[in-house]
């Protein structure tokens, strides 16, 4: 028996531990099954008596919800979306799930796949538990498909707002209705769409630190688990899910056209019964009011700080990170497999929302910063991004921290009003300036085993991550875009970011960039520096310090012409001229008209006086070279179109206009022939190639604004010289004019040759006072004339010499105002130009004694040798097209010249001045009645006919040539107070609204009329005085003499110069003013003292001058 019982006892001893282990395993399995959440059948009594021991996912129908809780250990990897593998948790002490450690914190994360996870921030971000409620993802939509809305795409936001993306315009706009407004609106959306759907709220009661589902409440009711075993001291997390679903179906077929569903979670913390003092409600209270539906607002956001650790969420990288607040280094991070929708920090009985859009970055300690600039760039978190555009399973969605759509009212009727044509609904716009979340565009993927496993289990995420899915996200290495919300659209943040380098303990770890040794490149560096200095000096001198001989202001009567042809060279190209003659081109101007004289030249071109060969009457012909650009050409055509529509006694009469496009160099050659033709009364002639003069431009005074141009024409027949002086100075006024031109001759036989030199100079040099560089002719013999003689130059009297003067009152190139007047002491000359030159005087000269202008030599000399053929090498850049305008012939003397010739109050009779002004006002009133405005009224634009009738002219031609950037006409249609902001016209006569660039109307002409009336009644002694007084009058500061002598005119001028356009009178009321009623205008006024032209059929035209401004002896 002892032998038999010995082995048996040994066997029983060995089997006893095995039985005990089997019993312990059974108990452990039961306890594990208690930890698992029940399924939907057990929750709502759908046929299951008890919760199964394994978590299974049941498709959500209606409000059926399944839940799965996974308790993680330190070795477990994060659970992937839709993961079905069984997890066997490691046995833990029995008291750990039940007893909550003091001061324990949790980071609760909600992801787009509908799962809830808890991380332990005190244990390096270890996942504490993971819950799948089984109700599907938070976002689902078919609105992004191109076949739904064409080029427009509707992108839902997780909080229920809708945004519209326009592919063509690349703009993001907020749709003026939300999901709730869609549900509240009528069930019929248009004629072919019916809206169905609803809003569901589901509340989950979870154990804060174990993840157990205690109860689930929805519209179908509530279901509880383990009420008996539930401990009162355990903390509860109240998780509420709001899901909004809208479906559009066809009313006849019932087929679904599009749908979308968005949802989000809200978290509250319910502490145990003993720690009610730590209870703080969530910032969100469930309500249908949109103003109360904010989860996080800018004011309410607070940084998730735990001791010295800051919790941050990277939406684009799906990461939760913890940074050390003092050092700024990364302590731990956790990578999720799906995008993060919301995040909270549960700490000390409080729920602190974690901002998903906080740009404040913390640099990890192991990543050493390169320089101080990197630190500043890393700490630039002063602003937040407002909207994040991401993608989940091929579906675009938006997350926003600032509710942009709350600033705009939403209406259930918004859908109907959008379809109406007259509806005006302001749509907020998010500027499409996406900020890619990655710091660099370099396509480098950082390897992550955990993230790769997530992608391998989710084909949608993998495809989305690899190819960017839709057209908005084309860059394959970015998961989304940040759309910034600028500071001017929101209140200033209370948080201020301060960067302190000295107080940072890690400042010593900053690695300075290695210096680059450039010693062996010193030659290249020095050469580059020298080259830059030389180039900069040259450019500055050329641009800002032009040649002193070219420093000359342009005046409105400056001798300019558009047919700037080359000077006559010593060796003419006969072959090219023969080709032009044989081209067969016939000019209409030469066919119908006979040129008489040059009336003047300016920025607009050339004005001729010509006699029509058919009716034998004289007309003014304007010849303008049209610019090549189409827009500028249209501006030049303004005057033609304006004059053709205007027929009034006070406006220059228009007869005809035509275009001519001569062959290359044809116009220049024909000008030479016209100048050489003595049969016409043309004051300009061309010198022969042998007598081609040389031009010398000199500055007479280094402190003077005048220039000297001396032309020396060599002559083999005479040793005496002939000089001419032209003052090219300009006053400070914009209305300045050239000083007269003086001729002083040495030999009467050479007067015609000198006149030829003058004419050639004006056609080639005086256009812009420019010319090709040439050598100075050193021959002392020959004919010369000097422009702009020095005021200090001595005048030498000589009995052997005779003198004559030529007056250029409007333009330096017009000497045709002369008249043939025989002189007693002048010998006969074969050439008829001698008679013309002997009859011309300076307008301000009081003596007829002969004078000679002597110019001392100056070092700054620019000589233009016109005998060189190199000048003729210039070729026109494009074919020239000329516009000819035939219009009424007026006097050369305009109102500006008339005012300058009468510098005293006695010389300006009140009745004459008011008569002139009344005629101007009548012309302006006619313009305004036609819906037009002049915009450039000034004395130089007021002309006189041969019968002393005032004419208003220059309807925008000068403006069109000088202001290419102005797109509006000077004669502009005037529908009431139209908006015109172009700064055109002379600034001295411009209204304040024109100068300031504000909108203006036809009242700008009234302002100019007021200044003209004042200038008519109040003479000025000098141009400086004129500018100063007119500037004061613009500010309603009148001279006392004017107010005393003309009280009624003073009151009218005050009204016309009112700063407010509405207070200025109309032109019609000005004409009807009482000051014009008691005046008797004589049939022939003092205007007859001005120069007038007389012509008779068959006789050459001559101009007589009897003005006191330019007295000439009547010998």
UniProtKB/Swiss-Prot annotation:
Residues 536-1115 are cytoplasmic. It is found in: Endoplasmic reticulum membrane. Residues 74-101, 807-832, 841-860, 1087-1115 are annotated as: Disordered. The chain crosses the membrane at residues 515-535. Inhibited by HSPA5/BIP in absence of stress. Perturbation in protein folding in the endoplasmic reticulum (ER) promotes reversible dissociation from HSPA5/BIP and oligomerization, resulting in trans-autophosphorylation and kinase activity induction. Inactivated following phosphorylation at Thr-802 by AKT (AKT1, AKT2 and/or AKT3). Inhibited by ATAD3A at mitochondria-endoplasmic reticulum contact sites, providing a safe haven for mitochondrial protein translation during ER stress. PANTHER family: EUKARYOTIC TRANSLATION INITIATION FACTOR 2-ALPHA KINASE 3, EUKARYOTIC TRANSLATION INITIATION FACTOR 2-ALPHA KINASE EIF2-ALPHA KINASE -RELATED. The lumenal domain senses perturbations in protein folding in the ER, probably through reversible interaction with HSPA5/BIP. The insert loop specifically recongnizes and binds EIF2S1/eIF-2-alpha. Belongs to the protein kinase superfamily. Ser/Thr protein kinase family. GCN2 subfamily. This is Eukaryotic translation initiation factor 2-alpha kinase 3. It comes from Bos taurus (Bovine). The gene is EIF2AK3.
